[in-house]
Amino acid sequence: MPFVGIISKENDSNFIKNAISKNSKESNFEIININRKSIENVKNVKFDILVICENIEKMIKNSSYLEEIIRKSDYIIVNSDIKENLSILKNVEANIITYGFNAKATITISSIKEEKMMICVQRKIKAVNSIIEEQDFNVEIEKNNVNKLYNVLVIFTILAIYGKILQKI
């Protein structure tokens, strides 16, 4: 059972958790939202994947636990549109996968048309049991989820690490 920690607003974390559950019925993911109040409670958890959706500068300054959580994680999925996070992760040895709407992101969106989007893997990713090559993936997206594109990139990446391809959200 993969342990996934998500540093994000609670509603984003819940959206990601529900979508992962819906799209990976045979894999039981344990997904935990991490915030300033809960960080001490999860300080000893080794996350298979740590997702960083928001700026963690203040959280790092106020808690030594986050550095330890980052250090112990196998994969770190980070929003590369938040530049401050990239400098914090400079010396981390985990598999770092970036996502965002910039040319340097590992996972980005190459196009959106009505209810379809193309998610682009721009660099090889070492998944748990395979390698994900550079390529585009077509994903159907419901109209009410169009404003959650960052979350869709996170969901795609988590599933891909475990060999699953997101087709509809």
Can you annotate each of these PLM segments?
Residues 1-76, 84-92:
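Phosphate-binding loop of NTP-binding sites
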Residues 2, 101-169:
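Adenine nucleotide phosphate-binding catalytic loops in nucleotide-utilizing enzymes
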Residues 26, 95, 165:
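Residue-level detector of anion-binding/catalytic polar loops
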Residues 27-28, 54, 71-75, 98-101, ...:
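Short, surface-exposed linear patches
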Residues 52, 59, 66-67, 97-99, ...:
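Broad hydrophobic/π-residue packing in well-ordered secondary structure
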